[in-house]
């Protein structure tokens, strides 16, 4: 296809190993998805002593859908995938860690073409049925020869139970692998949804340095898959932020093998899809929250709920403004219940707000109501809440029915330590 324009991790690019996040979650009991095989190998792209290349093979007839970064400087693999998605089918997914293949000009495009051609030859499929992703350092040419040389081993290692190894292979500054699973029914037919993700820094809507891949054995057409994924992404990966930086490489994809052979569903609003839709949304949110839990240097997960806004969009923007405020994030890191910084963030958002109708709560305790401090406010429960690992901030604007939820993490010196030495 011609392209139109939990462990300690050590790498060449980081002098010290990264400790596992205190907010880490263990891998769940992963199962298999009929029609999907995965493998992970060491291609030596950037890291030493670990796998850095994952390959997934899908049964013929697998349907794909995806959403990609809105960054104006996308990587070559993002452009490749957008083009590949103009046809509904997928036979392979190839993901490397350590090099983003971004801002590499014609060489980056050629690397995609070479990797897709080599994968297609091994799996006997058209190159346009091969989806590609790269994550890592920007501006360095992708050593595709190393990837291509590792492909035979990747093909030989393909297995149905390769999910956990695949999750580890795509990590960069991640400190733990991320995966989730759901078992549901469509019209009485059992179907399974399972996914993996990576992400730790450069995380902010629209999506981030975030890769997430979900597979299901459900039989669904591409238009339905695309609608489900876009809707689920809005409530999950587009509602998280670590550092407000939107990556050049992020993508979220779903692959449906159809082997569950459920009754055909060709309308996203069909009641038969209700259980599947809820499960997919829940799985996507679980994966997204794992990314926030693994935010670079993070020690606290923060949930920000905004209600009473002029519209849902306005509520979302206000929540993100709070979540991205360095003053709010550092106060949380210092366990300081400095609610005035929340008020500041609301006011600077550019969205409709009335100081005299604004209310703020932390940990379920209302601190300010209707533009003033609550009478006889007792800070003790708020101080106790700030010492926990999961912080809740609520804001009510009392202007309308708009509401939104956004998740972020605190901002510690660990973020500087990791990013100050990322390439050294």
From Swiss-Prot:
Keywords per UniProt: Acyltransferase, Amino-acid biosynthesis, Arginine biosynthesis, Autocatalytic cleavage, Cytoplasm, Multifunctional enzyme, Transferase
Residues annotated as binding substrate: 172, 198, 209, 296, 419, 424
Pfam family of the protein (one): ArgJ
EC number from the UniProt entry: 2.3.1.35, 2.3.1.1
Transmembrane domains' residue ranges: none
Known pathway: Amino-acid biosynthesis; L-arginine biosynthesis; L-ornithine and N-acetyl-L-glutamate from L-glutamate and N(2)-acetyl-L-ornithine (cyclic): step 1/1; Amino-acid biosynthesis; L-arginine biosynthesis; N(2)-acetyl-L-ornithine from L-glutamate: step 1/4
Keyword Nucleotidyltransferase (UniProt): no
InterPro entries the UniProt entry points to: Arg_biosynth_ArgJ (IPR002813), ArgJ-like_dom_sf (IPR016117), ArgJ_beta_C (IPR042195)
HAMAP family: ArgJ
Entry function: Catalyzes two activities which are involved in the cyclic version of arginine biosynthesis: the synthesis of N-acetylglutamate from glutamate and acetyl-CoA as the acetyl donor, and of ornithine by transacetylation between N(2)-acetylornithine and glutamate.
Protein name: Arginine biosynthesis bifunctional protein ArgJ
Lineage summary: Bacteria, Pseudomonadati, Pseudomonadota, Alphaproteobacteria, Acetobacterales
